[in-house]
Amino acid sequence: MERAILCALAIGAVLGGLDLLIGNRFKLGERFEEGFKLLGPTALSMAGILCLAPLLSGALESTLAPLWRALGLDPAMLGGILAIDMGGYQTAELLAQDAAIGRYAGILVAATLGCTVTFTIPLGAGMLRGLDAAGFYRGLLIGLGTLPVALLLGGAVSGIALLPLLIQTLPVALFSLLLMLGLKFFAAQSIRAFSAFAALLRWLSIIGLTAGAVQYIAGVALIPNLAPIEEAMKTVSGIGIVMLGSLPAAEVLRRVLSRPLMRLGQKLGMTDASLAALLVGFVSITPVLAMMKEMDLRGQTMNAAFAVCAASALAAHLGFTLSAAPQMILPLLLTKLFGGVLAAVLAVLLTKEKDAGEHASRAD
């Protein structure tokens, strides 16, 4: 299955490259170009954190890791609080007692829970206001509720036995519950905490990038035990190469599925933007958040729920996984697709009919 996925990505790269050669006639060439254009922003956001990964894991090793071991848990799970491409994988790998649990935490947990905490929630809080934000937070509650189920599926597919998988996933379920309670009853305070955490990671990334550049250029170690910046850039480059194929392939998939999804949206009484955003979100969450002002309340809730697991599956997260742990490609995509669809279906079932087709922003 992994081979079939990689072949599909390679075909996407061929289609994008050929279209670029003939003048972007089918609009796939621009998606091909976008893969490389994203290298700069990707490097700026993650290379510095990757350089600092040994220090982050060392800090966790001397603080929380002993408690985790005393509870019978693998310290690798601590890395899952960071996004997969913001040090989550490297931290989990360095802390892991069991390599399989390290991959589970660093790929599956970090690509879902970690991405939600460090990126989706702070970004959404900054972009959305009023009823738009209300639909977004409602969807996050649903998505966080289904997250442990999706992780159990992905962990089982990756080869982890059921009992160890349940034990290691329990802290994730409890943390998801705490996030749900925080967003439900202390939304403003929770958002401030998430935003501060995301800002801290941005600061650390810039510091790590600066120190890594100085060490590479001048041979001066401003920060001891820093991972070489060229290793971080190798990971970033791998993501960019994969996106040369994944972005055109995702565009083809979007075109194939757009009409069936539009018909489904009409049956559910939802706006076109609400259904179209699901396919966009499988590539990147940022444009989905921008589109939420065009959605009805049901669409906002559904897309936010979908994003907890499914965000960026066919772009940065797939590229990172192919570079770091290619054997986890199938578990990653199954976790993201199953979790996203399950959350989206629940969001539709749990929202009222009057929320469909009603433009949330008009009351903002």
Show where each model-derived region lies:
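Signature of multi-pass transmembrane helix bundles
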Residues: 1-48, 104-113, 118-245, 326-364
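Juxtamembrane/interfacial segments flanking transmembrane helices
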Residues: 23-28, 60, 253-260
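Short amphipathic alpha-helical coupling elements at transmembrane boundaries
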Residues: 30-38, 65-69, 231, 259-270
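Interfacial/capping segments of alpha-helical transmembrane domains
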Residues: 55-74
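Juxtamembrane "helix exit" motif at the C-terminal ends of alpha-helical transmembrane segments
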Residues: 56-60, 215, 313-327, 333, ...
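Alpha-helical membrane segments and immediately flanking helix-loop junctions
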Residues: 71-146, 271-325
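Long, well-ordered mid-to-C-terminal structural blocks that present hydrophobic/aromatic surfaces
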Residues: 221-273, 280
